[in-house]
Amino acid sequence: MSLAVCIILSGDYHYALSKSPDRHPTNEEVYREIGYETIDKALQEFAAHFNQGIELPLRTPPISFTHTLGRFNDLDGEDKDSLEIKYINEKLPDNHYKITVRPVEHRFPFKEEEVIKVIKLQDGEEAVYLDRDGFNVLSFERGYWQYTLSINKRASDLMLPGVLVQIANSIEFATEES
């Protein structure tokens, strides 16, 4: 009993709880452990690394999310560096949406057999709608960046590619406002 009081008084109560073998880590702890942080912080790190400004879409899919997270992946060589923005719902695991951004010069390739269709965006550029690993994906280029919007197929069964296109087009609006 006195050990518990010492832990509480020393301010290490939260730490002691988090290291308990009977306690499961929270989503926040798990994501923090693998490098996720606030979207703003990840955006700043990514933009500073490439010395380029970046805009994110203003829109999100019309499904509910409980968490928004960001991670700048600074890996070996700039060709592997990317920004990941995740939107998840801890109560509905199928509600998983991700934005990945990388420089156009290091664009992520895709296979022709993955392409469902090519769609023209509002700015006249083409986007590729893909079926990849259980996700519906829209990949397009805007300025210096390649954007890849991915949404879990189980969450997007009722959504047409038009939803991802609306999200992609909302970057143009954000750019005009800057």
Task: Place the predicted regions along the sequence by residue.
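Sec-dependent N-terminal signal peptides of Gram-positive bacterial secreted proteins and lipoproteins
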Residues: 1-18
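A sequence-composition feature that detects small, non-aromatic residues
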Residues: 4, 16, 42, 47-48, ...
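Generic hydrophobic/packing signal
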Residues: 12, 125-126, 164
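Short, solvent-exposed recognition patches
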Residues: 21-137, 142-143
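Surface-exposed amphipathic alpha-helical segments
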Residues: 148-178
